[in-house]
Design a protein with these regions (language model features):
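Fungal secretory targeting signals
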Residues: 1-17
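Glycan-recognition patch characteristic of GH18 chitinases/ENGases
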Residues: 17-115, 213-214, 339-349, 370, ...
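A cross-domain feature marking catalytic cores of carbohydrate-active enzymes
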Residues: 24-26, 48, 83-87, 127-129, ...
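Structural recognition of alpha->loop->beta junctions
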Residues: 34-46, 100-123, 127-129, 184-204
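Conserved, mostly hydrophobic/aromatic
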Residues: 44, 83, 125, 197, ...
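Substrate-binding surface in catalytic domains of secreted glycosidases
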Residues: 53-66, 130-292
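Glycan-binding loop/region signatures in secreted carbohydrate-active enzymes
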Residues: 71, 85, 242-304, 335-393, ...
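Secreted, short cysteine-rich peptides and small extracellular cysteine-rich domains stabilized by multiple disulfide
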Residues: 301-344
Length: 433
């Protein structure tokens, strides 16, 4: 017991100064910046390793999407490089690994070996979510995950023991309804084992909601932080989360969104089995989403289209949000990129341009929004101005230990959100001497 507490204390001391944690995901790597843009980032978290990798006595090797050596060169030599395990929709490996003492010991040992093999400085456990309400909530109801409420803190305790003085962080939900394992009773058991708590104070409305609202407003982000403080979280361990993307939702055409765009009704945003029905989504702040189409576009010959491919689809074909040419609704409806092909009806790109031009600031809720009445779309996103308010009204006021963002590769058009966070740290949460 003494050894475990001592190791935990060492790790906590290593993150005591105000910090900036940044996720780097494998799906947005085209224009990742170098050191001249990443000043102030203390923790770079490569995402993701699959949760199932660590349950075997002879585990499969984890293969990072970029070599850790190359990734380290993008940041200051003092930046700690971590790896995140899990992510949205990847919970099965955690459920299996946490179920009993033997499975927890095996999982933790394998994680420790993986960190050593790749030279990582720590691990982030991105379990969305212990106790239920994950992507699989229709296939695996919460009633079948009740045991995870008790095993989750034990799982973290085993990891703490196994990785020694390396950094252990967790990504935790932003929506109160997802706090199934995060209660006054369980909170202290969870937080004692970890060095950082990355609060996903974004996606605060999602496709399970039925009215519009801010996905990451100042007020609802503050509400989330207060919920964690209420269940025993040490503010020095909390990192306030920021999202480098805008979200859009299809509104009910019979609702009064013109008069009351905040709180107006949405259409059903999920299929009956809980899967995405394409009536909501996200748009990142990277060149492929935000920049005008290059003038020298060629016709696609390999089925790829969009900014990165520098190609448009042949006549009559649509360019999907993921950058592929096709003619079905999957390519031509919601998310269709009108700069790179034909769209049938809704063009997310065109709607977003209107949102950027005519967006409105909700000073009370602390978020930017826009209602596109022509397409019945509601947009919600963060701006540098509201990021500054979050530093003043949440990070400074609540004496939080730091901030985090998802993800670096999603802000590569102008780096406005990254720069706003760097400025916020300078203004409201200076580094310790």
């Amino acid at each position: 017991m003494f050894k475990r507490l001592a190791l935990g204390l060492l790790a906590v001391q290593s993150v005591a100064a105000t910090r900036f944690a940044m996720y780097i995901d494998e799906w947005h790597v085209t224009d990742l910046p170098s050191q001249n843009k990443t000043e102030g980032i203390d923790y770079a978290i490569m995402s993701f390793a699959a949760s199932k990798l660590f349950n075997s006595d002879s585990p499969e090797e984890y293969k990072p999407f970029e070599s850790p050596e190359t990734m380290r060169k993008r940041f200051s030599p003092d930046t700690k490089l971590m790896v995140a395990i899990g992510g949205w929709g990847d919970t099965a490996g955690f459920s299996e690994g946490a179920k009993d003492e033997a499975s927890r010991t095996r999982y933790a040992k394998n994680v420790a070996s993986m960190l050593d093999a790749h030279g990582f400085d720590g691990v982030d456990i991105d379990w969305e979510y212990p106790g239920g309400n994950g992507q699989d909530y229709k296939d695996t109801p919460n009633s079948k995950k009740v045991g995870e409420i008790e095993t989750y803190p034990l799982f973290l305790e085993a990891l703490r023991e196994a990785i020694g003085d390396k950094v252990l962080s967790i990504a935790v939900p932003g929506r109160k309804q997802d706090f199934i394992a995060f209660t006054k009773e369980q909170g202290p058991k969870i937080f004692k084992s970890v060095d950082m708590v990355n609060v996903m104070s974004y996606d605060l409305i999602n496709r399970r909601d039925n009215v519009t609202g801010h996905a990451s407003g100042v007020q609802n982000s503050l509400d989330t932080i207060n919920e964690y403080l209420a269940i025993g979280a040490d503010p020095a361990k909390l990192n306030l989360g920021f999202a480098y993307y805008a979200k859009w939702f299809t509104t009910d055409p019979d609702s009064d969104c013109d008069e009351n765009p905040l709180g107006c009704h949405l259409v059903k945003l999920e299929n009956d089995d809980g899967t995405d029905n394409g009536k909501s989504g996200a748009l990142t702040f990277e060149a492929s989403s935000a920049a005008a189409a290059p003038k020298d576009l060629k016709d696609s010959t390999d089925g790829l289209c969009g900014f990165g491919a520098k190609a448009k689809c042949p006549s009559g074909q649509c360019c999907s949000a993921s950058g592929y040419c096709g003619t079905t609704d999957e390519f031509c409806q919601a998310g269709c990129l009108s700069d790179y092909g034909t769209c049938k009806g809704l063009s997310i790109t065109d709607s977003w341009r209107k949102a950027q031009k005519d967006g409105k600031a909700d000073e009370k809720g602390g978020g930017q929004y826009y209602f596109d009445s022509e397409n019945n779309l509601f947009w919600t996103w963060d701006t540098p101005e509201f990021i500054a308010r979050k530093f003043k009204e949440i990070v400074a006021e609540k004496k939080l230990g730091g901030v985090m963002a998802w993800s670096l590769g999603e802000d590569t058009y102008k780096f406005e959100h990254l720069q706003a966070m760097q400025k916020g740290l300078e203004s409201h949460a200076p580094k310790a001497n």
